[in-house]
Amino acid sequence: MAVFEKVQDIIVDELGKEKEEVTLETSFEELDADSLDLFQIINDIEDEFDVEVDTEADMKTVADLVKYVENNK
């Protein structure tokens, strides 16, 4: 499974959104994700990919998060 698909699944599970709503271009603001949601998503991604996500990194879209994971796993 590709990184995007795993990240998409985590976001869908955490936010209760439909898969079609979570694309690479989707911003976390569009998904109505608050800071607690983002914390949980990042925590799940760290567990799934065995990476440490820099919370200071500027990640506004799903693509930003996917690129970060791909570059740091």
From Swiss-Prot:
The modification O-(pantetheine 4'-phosphoryl)serine is found at S35. One of its GO terms (cellular component) is cytoplasm. Pfam families: PP-binding (PF00550). InterPro entries: ACP, ACP-like_sf, PP-bd_ACP. Keywords: Cytoplasm, Fatty acid biosynthesis, Fatty acid metabolism, Lipid biosynthesis, Lipid metabolism, Phosphopantetheine, Phosphoprotein. Disulfide bonds: none annotated. Residues 1-73 form the Carrier domain. SUPFAM superfamilies: ACP-like. Coiled coil: none annotated. It is found in: Cytoplasm. 4'-phosphopantetheine is transferred from CoA to a specific serine of apo-ACP by AcpS. This modification is essential for activity because fatty acids are bound in thioester linkage to the sulfhydryl of the prosthetic group. One of its GO terms (molecular function) is acyl carrier activity. Pathway: Lipid metabolism; fatty acid biosynthesis. Carrier of the growing fatty acid chain in fatty acid biosynthesis. Belongs to the acyl carrier protein (ACP) family. This is Acyl carrier protein. It comes from Lactococcus lactis subsp. lactis (strain IL1403). The lineage of its organism: Bacteria, Bacillati, Bacillota, Bacilli, Lactobacillales. The gene is acpP.
